A protein has these predicted regions:
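Bacterial N-terminal signal peptides
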Residues: 8-17
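Bacterial N-terminal signal peptides that target proteins for export
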Residues: 1-9
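Beta-strand-rich, non-transmembrane domain signature
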Residues: 22-196
Length: 196
């Protein structure tokens, strides 16, 4: 009886020592963010993502919409591609009425920021196992921002299989960067007059 008590206590301690990891709601197959400072002073932020949904919460709450904030007085938003690949392989293109322009909620009680816009991309054709594909750019006109100044978190709510963050500047400009709390070493190369 005493041995049985020790076995139960040992088993309970092992169960507590190894916490159960919850399954993720979704998974990014690829997430790519590219920031480019062009020679004329204009800037481009290009985001490409592939996101596979696993739960109803991911479809209906977490990832059913994508939000892109920009200032139309100085910036232009270009949606290069937006569609959903369903589990059976069929593709559902995002219709024109699924791109909804609204005032960002943070600017609601701030009249000075009422010129900002938030593009809500409502992803259509969602089902469990579907993959969302979104590729867009926010292009900033010359003179609005003098240099690239990026502070980007590498973490998302769901796991990421492939994450690419790139900064590109003309080769005559210095490229200053810092990677905090990471073990990766950035690769710097110069191609066609651009330092990346």
């Amino acid at each position: 009886m005493k041995n049985m008590h020790y076995y139960i206590v040992t088993l309970a301690m092992l169960i507590l020592a190894f916490p159960v990891k919850a399954a993720s709601e979704a998974e990014f197959g690829k997430l790519s963010k590219a920031y480019t400072l062009h020679a004329d002073g204009s800037q481009e932020m290009r985001v490409q993502k592939e996101l596979t949904l696993f739960t109803h919460a991911a479809m209906n709450g977490l990832y059913g919409e994508s939000f892109i904030i920009y200032n139309p007085a100085y910036q232009e938003l270009k949606i290069h591609e937006s569609y959903t690949r369903q589990k059976d392989g069929s593709i559902v293109k995002t219709p024109d009425n699924a791109f909804v322009e609204v005032l960002p909620s943070a600017a609601a009680d701030a009249p000075a920021y009422n010129g900002l816009k938030e593009m809500v991309v409502v992803h259509t054709g969602l089902e469990l196992g579907a993959t969302i594909y979104l590729d867009y750019s926010v292009i900033t006109r010359p003179g609005y921002l003098p240099e690239l100044d990026i502070c980007e978190s590498v973490e998302e709510l769901s796991p990421i299989k492939e994450y690419v963050l790139s900064l590109s500047v003309p080769d005559n400009k210095p490229l200053h960067y810092e990677l905090l709390n990471g073990k990766m070493t950035p690769v710097v190369k110069t191609v066609a007059g651009m330092k990346t």
